A protein has these predicted regions:
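N-terminal, charged low-complexity regulatory/assembly segments
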Residues: 26-106
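Amphipathic interaction/junction segments at domain boundaries or subunit interfaces
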Residues: 97-192
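C-terminal edge-of-domain segments
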Residues: 226-235
Length: 257
């Protein structure tokens, strides 16, 4: 048995750890077409690695993370190439590609993760910007009108890329805002790869985001289990809500009567 002084032993451990770090799969080395696809966002990367650290010992974490990275690249190798890359606002934090990254994590770590954990990951990506907008009150006509204009602007972006096919109903004073998607790349991806079971965890954030604006989302169907994803949005004090109580269906979707 060879005995090393503690200082020499610490140096050896540090060098070994450094070698392990050098063996990490770098994001820049992932093989996918970056002319049409984008890498998952840094916040998404942080979320996934945090969950891996929660479930796996330190000696396994880099291996698991590399599996997630490779699965992401594999998915993109057989995925549509017309989503606009970095130019499309839907491909930012919490958007289409982050959803694909989370689904990559789910396929690799399905044995240890949970529905609520996936739901939480998407919330942590989407909700921070809505928390900064807590001063918005959808019960007030002015804010409701400004929200409507924001949805109309979003539709123009959708019309440019034809990723989320969006229709916005005309604005009516005193009535809820309504718009719908008849196409959703995230839902399309989940259907293609047999991952629809986890889509409710990614879709439910829409309800949580509206609640931060003193608003309520009323939804009856999604592109995952129907032909559209509907958004009826009103203030959280609107009498309209009494006729549309919220519930969770068997799949885990938050929806309304």
């Amino acid at each position: 048995m060879v005995c090393l002084p503690k200082s020499r032993l610490n140096d050896f451990v540090r060098k070994t750890e450094s070698k392990d770090e050098n063996k990490q799969m770098k994001d820049k080395n992932l093989l996918f077409d970056r002319n049409c696809h984008v890498l998952y966002s840094k916040p998404c990367r942080k979320e996934i690695r945090a969950k891996i650290a929660l479930h796996y010992p330190a000696t396994e974490r880099e291996t698991v993370w590399e599996k997630v990275q490779r699965r992401y690249a594999e998915f993109l190798s057989d995925w549509r190439t017309d989503l606009g890359g970095k130019k499309n606002f839907h491909n930012g934090v919490g958007g289409t590609y982050d959803c694909i990254a989370i689904m990559s994590y789910y396929t690799v770590c399905k044995a240890v993760t949970s529905f609520r954990e996936i739901e939480e990951m998407e919330e942590n990506l989407i909700l921070p910007i809505f928390r900064r907008l807590r001063f918005v009150d959808c019960n007030k006509p002015l804010w409701r009108k400004l929200m409507y204009r924001a949805f109309v602007r979003a539709k123009r972006g959708c019309d440019k890329w034809h990723d989320y096919e969006m229709t916005v109903a005309p604005y009516e004073n005193g009535k809820p805002i309504y718009y719908e998607f008849t196409a959703c790349p995230a839902a399309e991806f989940a259907i293609k790869y047999g991952l629809t079971d986890i889509m409710p965890a990614l879709c439910n954030v829409d309800f949580a985001s509206m609640e931060l604006l003193h608003a309520k989302l009323v939804r009856t169907t999604t592109c995952v289990d129907g032909c559209r994803c509907d958004y009826t949005i009103c203030g959280d004090k609107d009498p309209y809500l009494k006729g549309h109580p919220e519930y969770r269906d068997e799949a885990g979707f938050r929806r309304n009567r």
